[in-house]
């Protein structure tokens, strides 16, 4: 059927939820040719930034660039609404540097909605999904080895699809808390999606609850910003997307502020009114993003905590108080806010609140983010136990790609409702992408608190730099049809130019006249420019100053060539470790492998293997508590 005449039935892919995971999932599926329906509770809130108005950060910025390299949208959306840019960790090595931007959150959501609306294979529908209908459902409601058939909405509609992607965010069975007040909402003033979490549990899925929170928003005109420290931004806004050449937009200013003993005293006197401490909230929150009352309680020796004052948009007078998340009552929020320097007359427009919500244990997923219990059902984002827009977007992209590929394989299946043998999932390894690291962590280790990406989680972070995302991923996306020919051609040109410049620097020697003009080169006399770059005291600027030929290349190409040379010995060593890892990753474990039939496995390892059901020997080796001797037994058993 054509993209113009398909109706709200018989879709290839249905995506549930219009947040950052849902945006990437629905666009990826539609762009791969799947007739896609995005169902969201409120069309007007698609792409809304529920918490801080920023994109990127340490390792998170790398994920955004990976999304872009794979043909996703988050990087382009960030470029379209960027109002400040900073490259984090500039004083440290390139493996831990990441871009972070402040975004105009209203423009971000508006641009996201328009992008979805104009996508030719995509429809948007406003309703609430309360159940996923599948085959192989027992009288008890439990599903074993079922396949997706349809979704059921709150208004009683049954909409069929070959694949469904759940990206429910904080809305599935969500509840917000502000002191003594609580309500079934996923965001302040927006009703929760009630019913779907219960339906999934009834089907046999292991469910849990996690918590997050957000700080209050404050009127800019009520704050004396002149007494606050300005947070310096980079002079030039650099794009996230490889498709964006330059960014020319008005820049906004962020500020730094600190809590003080008066703030902490107000908080301490009201610990008993916090639902976090009174027993109302039982769900676990993010370890690395605690509420202000949690910080004051856990670190009583600290006399102050740093806060960042961030604008919500260029056409908004609201400020976001980063680091001031709370679930305390509104009167307490007023008191503690006014103890801050410059905030004596501050006016809150939206109170801080905590929200807990239902999640699915990601141990029930495969590396394609498909559930093992129901074929064709994929999950992405906070439903899998992660936190953050970027983590959600990365998962959404992978889930959307695989939902489209699964649907395509179903269309060639002679018997509807059975698992398609032709389905070949699109997955990422740990050495390919931070997205690959994240998904492997989720499905191998599970979560007991909201998962956040850090560079320290990646063993191969020197290979996963933000500037190499296109080199690692664009060709793969091009091969499945998600990247354009122009993007692939640009990548080939980049690699050719970098290789050409590296070859030139390996051949060009440091002469006596150059060493005389640049004393720093004296100890490298007779060596190549490339050899000199191994010396940390020799800068790229010095090399370019001595080499007029390098002016033919862009700054990006010169920097890429420099890093390739400067870290080549480390990269070679890392490549050797990757080769060893790949051998274990290619040793696949059959999907329905009977671990009980393997003699020699320890009891605890047997239980862990059956719980995770790893896809490869490599994944099995990363399950916490699995011993090397058990891996050897397993390798013998699957041969």
How should each PLM-predicted stretch be described?
Residues 457, 463, 474-632, 636-638:
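Extended, charge-enriched "interface" segments that sit outside catalytic cores
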Residues 404-411, 419-447:
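Active-site-proximal substrate-binding core of FAD-dependent oxidoreductases
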Residues 42-44, 198-334, 432, 444-516, ...:
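An anion/pyrophosphate-binding glycine-rich loop and adjacent beta-alpha core
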Residues 7-21:
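Beta1/beta-strand and adjacent pyrophosphate-binding region of the FAD-binding site
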Residues 16, 158-169:
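Short hydrophobic core segments
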């Amino acid at each position: 059927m054509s993209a113009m005449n398909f109706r709200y039935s018989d879709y290839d892919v249905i995506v549930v939820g219009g947040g950052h995971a849902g945006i990437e999932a629905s666009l990826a599926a539609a762009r791969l040719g799947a007739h896609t329906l995005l169902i969201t509770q409120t069309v007007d809130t698609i792409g809304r930034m529920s918490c801080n108005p920023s994109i990127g950060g340490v390792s998170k910025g790398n994920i955004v660039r990976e999304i872009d390299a794979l043909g996703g949208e988050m990087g382009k959306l960030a470029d379209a609404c960027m109002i400040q840019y900073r490259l984090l960790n500039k004083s440290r090595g390139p493996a831990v540097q990441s871009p972070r931007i402040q975004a105009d959150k209203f423009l971000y959501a508006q641009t996201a909605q328009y992008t979805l609306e104009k996508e030719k294979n995509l429809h948007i529908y406003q309703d609430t999904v309360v159940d996923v209908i599948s085959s192989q459902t027992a009288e008890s409601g439990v599903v074993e080895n079922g396949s997706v058939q349809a979704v059921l909405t709150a208004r009683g509609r049954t909409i069929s699809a070959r694949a469904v992607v759940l990206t429910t965010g904080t809305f599935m069975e969500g509840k917000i808390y502000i002191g003594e007040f609580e309500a079934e909402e996923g965001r302040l003033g927006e009703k929760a999606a009630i019913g779907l979490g219960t339906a999934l549990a009834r089907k046999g899925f292991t469910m849990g609850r996690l918590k997050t929170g957000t700080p209050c928003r404050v009127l800019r005109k009520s704050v004396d910003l002149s007494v606050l420290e300005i947070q310096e931004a980079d002079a030039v806004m650099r794009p996230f997307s490889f498709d964006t050449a330059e960014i020319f937009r008005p820049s906004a200013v962020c500020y730094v502020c600190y809590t003080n003993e008066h703030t902490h005293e107000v908080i301490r006197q009201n610990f008993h009114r916090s639902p976090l401490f009174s027993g109302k909230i039982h769900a676990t929150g993010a370890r690395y993003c605690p509420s202000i009352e949690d910080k004051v309680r856990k670190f009583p020796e600290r006399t102050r905590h740093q806060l960042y004052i961030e604008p919500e948009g260029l056409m908004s007078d609201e400020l976001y108080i980063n680091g001031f998340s709370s679930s305390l009552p509104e009167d307490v929020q007023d008191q503690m806010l006014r103890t801050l320097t410059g905030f004596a007359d501050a006016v809150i427009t939206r109170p801080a609140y905590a929200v807990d919500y239902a999640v699915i244990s990601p141990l029930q997923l495969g590396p394609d983010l498909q559930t093992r219990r129901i074929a064709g059902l994929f999950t992405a984002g906070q439903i899998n136990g992660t936190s953050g827009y970027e983590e959600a977007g990365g998962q959404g992209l992978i889930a959307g790609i695989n939902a489209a590929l699964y649907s395509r394989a179903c269309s060639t299946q002679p018997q509807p409702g059975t698992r398609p043998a032709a389905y070949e999932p699109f997955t990422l390894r740990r050495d390919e992408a931070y997205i690959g690291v994240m998904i492997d962590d989720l499905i191998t280790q599970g979560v007991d608190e909201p998962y956040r990406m850090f560079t320290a989680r990646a063993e191969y972070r020197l290979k996963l730099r933000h500037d190499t995302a296109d080199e690692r991923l664009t060709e793969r996306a091009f091969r499945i049809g998600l990247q354009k020919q122009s993007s692939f051609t640009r990548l080939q040109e980049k690699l050719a130019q970098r290789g050409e410049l590296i070859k030139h620097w390996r051949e060009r020697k440091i002469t006596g006249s150059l060493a005389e003009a640049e004393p720093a080169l004296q100890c490298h006399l007779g060596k190549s420019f490339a050899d000199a770059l191994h010396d940390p005291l020799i800068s790229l600027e010095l090399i370019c100053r001595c080499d007029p030929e390098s002016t033919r290349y862009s700054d990006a190409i010169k920097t890429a060539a420099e890093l390739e040379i400067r870290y080549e010995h480390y990269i070679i060593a890392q490549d050797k470790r990757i080769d060893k890892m790949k051998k274990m990753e290619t040793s696949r474990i059959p999907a329905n492998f009977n671990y009980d039939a393997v003699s020699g496995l320890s009891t605890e390892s047997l239980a862990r293997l059956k719980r995770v059901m790893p896809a490869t020997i490599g994944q099995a080796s990363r399950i916490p508590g699995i011993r090397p001797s058990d891996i050897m037994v397993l390798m013998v058993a699957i041969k």
